[in-house]
């Protein structure tokens, strides 16, 4: 069976020759290349530095090692690798239209982008599920550390399986003396296999998880925002606990919306290309692709900024991480925020949450007399509370 080269993430630009100039139709002026290189370099530096800092903040401070934050580590790791590998090397390939990096890295370049995207969005989905159980069903058993690690490993394995077809059909070709890294799909009567693959990828790593997260965060929002705190406790630990949960949910909703907005044009671009493949041969397509690819890759750099702006513990962590900078002055409060164990008074106050939820109609009497309440404040280690209550 014959094969034909199909445009994909690693072979988006074909090696068309210009009859007038003798150079590739996708050559660009040096000043334009310099602007794009600056934009991509800034993206990679911000994404790698920000996500590496997020990983350090969680791993270096025991108080930050929660189930939710382990999924955030997984998300940050996928984003860091996406920026360091996919954004960097694919930009060089798309801007020069020559593959410089050999056959082995061609396989990797067609395997890793889909893998990282899957890991990113399903880490967000796992966070949404964890928050849903903690807030909507606070008395159900929470994920243990081994279960969390198993889920993370499962996400990576499924992601690799989903990306494997592109890796399997990857190959190196030489066109007019220029080396290309392409995905050569089997000839399947008009590219039906390619269209099916793109649609499956779109559903599994975009539409379906976004739909699940939309439903989860809608229920979480309704649960939190209808929850009232009795007037005599309106300025106590219960109110702070509720406000912390709301702020964390807002941050994660913003993370999900950012991902959705950044990646939608990129997905639509490839789906459109399966119906009208000739668009890839227009001269302007290089600039369109570089813009859409930059927008998609930029999703890797926004999350650390969101965490820093909307979460006080991550903000303290960033101050500590960049304390060598002259304009950053961490305080003792920042250090205590990440290392200090909550005081006994705060733990006792949190014990009264059961009574508060029962008084506001958020739980039944049987729920108010058994089990634990909710989840710890964002960033605090989960642990038994109220055991001494009689």
Curated annotation (Swiss-Prot):
PANTHER family in UniProt: G-PROTEIN COUPLED RECEPTOR TKR-1-RELATED, SUBSTANCE-K RECEPTOR
Name this polypeptide is given: Substance-K receptor
Protein localization: Cell membrane
One GO process term, biological-process aspect: positive regulation of vascular permeability
Region of interest called Disordered, as start-end residue ranges on this chain: 365-390
Taxonomic lineage from the root: Eukaryota, Metazoa, Chordata, Craniata, Vertebrata
Pfam families: 7tm_1 (PF00001)
Feature: compositional bias, Polar residues: 366-375
Positions on the Cytoplasmic side per record topology: 57-69, 130-149, 219-251, 311-390
InterPro entries on file: GPCR_Rhodpsn, GPCR_Rhodpsn_7TM, Neurokn_rcpt, NK2_rcpt
Stretches in topological domain Extracellular: 1-32, 91-107, 171-196, 273-290
Keyword Metal-binding appears in the UniProt entry: no
Entry keyword Membrane: yes
Lipid moiety-binding residues (S-palmitoyl cysteine): 324
Membrane topology label: Multi-pass membrane protein
Family (UniProt): Belongs to the G-protein coupled receptor 1 family.
Keyword annotations: Cell membrane, Disulfide bond, G-protein coupled receptor, Glycoprotein, Lipoprotein, Membrane, Palmitate, Receptor, Transducer, Transmembrane, Transmembrane helix
Functional description taken from the UniProt entry: This is a receptor for the tachykinin neuropeptide substance K (neurokinin A). It is associated with G proteins that activate a phosphatidylinositol-calcium second messenger system. The rank order of affinity of this receptor to tachykinins is: substance K > neuromedin-K > substance P.
Gene name in the database record: Tacr2
Gene Ontology terms for molecular function: substance K receptor activity
One term under GO cellular component: sperm flagellum
Transmembrane annotation, as ranges: 33-56, 70-90, 108-129, 150-170, 197-218, 252-272, 291-310
